[in-house]
Curated annotation (Swiss-Prot):
Keywords: ATP-binding, Cell cycle, Cell division, Cell shape, Cell wall biogenesis/degradation, Cytoplasm, Ligase, Nucleotide-binding, Peptidoglycan synthesis. This is UDP-N-acetylmuramoylalanine--D-glutamate ligase. One of its GO terms (molecular function) is UDP-N-acetylmuramoylalanine-D-glutamate ligase activity. Its main location: cytoplasm. It is found in: Cytoplasm. Belongs to the MurCDEF family. It catalyses: UDP-N-acetyl-alpha-D-muramoyl-L-alanine + D-glutamate + ATP = UDP-N-acetyl-alpha-D-muramoyl-L-alanyl-D-glutamate + ADP + phosphate + H(+). Cell wall formation. Catalyzes the addition of glutamate to the nucleotide precursor UDP-N-acetylmuramoyl-L-alanine (UMA). It comes from Shigella sonnei (strain Ss046). The gene is murD.
């Protein structure tokens, strides 16, 4: 465990994670300073009076006087103020690094462009089914530092590329990169390989690396080695097996579960299940309890969630599809009896939308594109696309057109922040309108 006594600690960014960092240091007899570029950041009213705070901008004087800077994942390491501090030899970490220095129980670490919240939650459910005292959080749910507990037997952490950038002490019992597709390109000016490099940090010092056999970008730089186990649709140690019209999860040639026993549906969710099973096996969880968890787990909100099935029409909320890869996963192998009414739009974060084009062929697809990058998305197939300013306008446009066998799918391939507070608000608004219009 690290000793922070006598250190001048500065925390950048409040919110729940920032507050967890403040509490962490106060519990160790260190009073940090806090700054946030927002004038009234969330959690400001919960800061103890003894903690100095600076809001509305970064305070370079504080930063250059610090011994340790704990930076929110929301601030880029390339920010001039952080670059200057790094050049001056000041240590810059994030909350995950603080956590890794303290955690006494094994850690399962999960990252990827898509599916990581589902897999993280699922591994947590597998641990609970085995009677293990487990802490689940990180980039979802509770911040990692709030999970620290002497009685915890296993930690399962979802980690973003931003969090991994400032983490160097992670030694996971099992770590995975589920997939790598373009995301946050506004934060990675050198492109996909720079983004991938941040993700690859998760494998450093990992006991087992769980890689995606269908995605070479998830492999360690030196390629697969004896630490690696793989999952995939048709390839990998953990893969899908199709026989006589049925689909099975299979591990090294052995059929372990028929997917019809699972409440999750869709090929992308079956591969999520394989990844979770590989991680649970690597962490030493009993296979039987892991399989039991797979039969009871219903999935997470806003992730290919059926919010209404009425008059033979399914309305599906996939608002968590905030990038192209996630929407590709939703469309890959999608079965629709009638017409697919696909809602796309929002802030594309400088992504290339062209990989979606191959899923939009055929006579049974209609596109409804909205938000900041609606025009770019409509250009994928203009003859079947309509553009509106808002998602609500798009839904009111399509509602009179839906018929028996149709599907209305919100899988926007974009962030929501141009028109919504977050993807949850967007998904809730879709669900509300579906129930009104369906």
């Amino acid at each position: 465990m690290a000793d922070y006594q006598g250190k001048n600690v500065v925390i950048i960014g409040l919110g729940l994670t920032g507050l967890s960092c403040v509490d962490f240091f106060l519990a160790r007899g260190v009073t940090p300073r806090v700054m946030d570029t927002r004038m009234t950041p969330p959690g400001l009213d919960k800061l103890p009076e003894a903690v100095e705070r600076h809001t509305g901008s970064l305070n370079d004087e504080w930063l250059m006087a610090a011994d340790l800077i704990v930076a929110s994942p929301g601030i880029a390491q390339a920010h001039p103020s952080l670059s200057a501090a790094a050049d001056a030899g000041i240590e810059i970490v994030g909350d995950i690094e603080l956590f890794c220095r303290e955690a006494q129980a094994p850690i399962v670490a999960i990252t990827g462009s898509n599916g990581k919240s589902t897999v993280t939650t699922l591994v947590g459910e597998m641990a609970k089914a085995a009677g293990v005292n487990v802490g689940v959080g990180g980039n979802i749910g509770l911040p990692a530092l709030m999970l620290l507990d002497a009685e915890c037997e296993l930690y399962v952490l979802e980690l973003s590329s931003f969090q991994l950038e400032t983490t160097s002490s992670l030694q996971a019992v099992a770590a995975t990169i589920l997939n790598v597709t373009e995301d946050h390109m506004d934060r990675y000016p050198f492109g996909l390989q720079q983004y991938r490099a941040a993700k690859l940090r998760i494998y450093e010092n990992a006991k087992v690396c769980v890689v995606n056999a269908d995605d070479a970008l998830t492999m360690p730089i030196r390629g697969a080695d004896e630490r690696c186990v793989s999952f995939g649709v048709n390839m990998g140690d953990y893969h899908l097996n199709h026989q006589q019209g049925e689909t099975w999860l299979r591990v090294k040639g052995e059929k372990v579960l028929n997917v019809k026993e699972m409440k999750l549906s869709g090929q992308h969710n079956y591969t999520n299940a394989l990844a979770a099973l590989a991680l649970a096996d690597a962490a030493g969880l009993p296979r039987a309890s892991s399989l039991k968890a797979l039969t009871t787990f219903t999935g997470l909100p806003h992730r290919f969630e059926v919010v209404l099935e009425h008059n033979g029409v399914r309305w599906i909320n996939d608002s968590k599809a905030t990038n192209v890869g996630s929407t590709e996963a939703a469309l890959n192998g999608l079965q629709v009896d009638g017409t697919l009414h696909l809602l796309l739009g929002g802030d594309g974060k400088s992504a290339d939308f062209s990989p979606l084009a191959r899923y939009l062929n055929g006579d049974n697809v209609r596109l409804y594109c909205f938000g900041r990058d609606g025009a770019q998305l409509a250009a994928l197939r203009p003859e079947v696309a309509e553009q509106t300013e808002t998602m609500e306008q798009a839904m009111r446009l399509l509602a009179p057109r839906v018929q028996l066998g149709d599907m209305v799918l919100l899988s926007p391939a974009c962030a929501s922040l141009d028109q919504f507070k977050n993807f949850e608000q967007r998904g809730n608004e879709f669900a509300r309108l579906a129930k009104e219009l369906g």
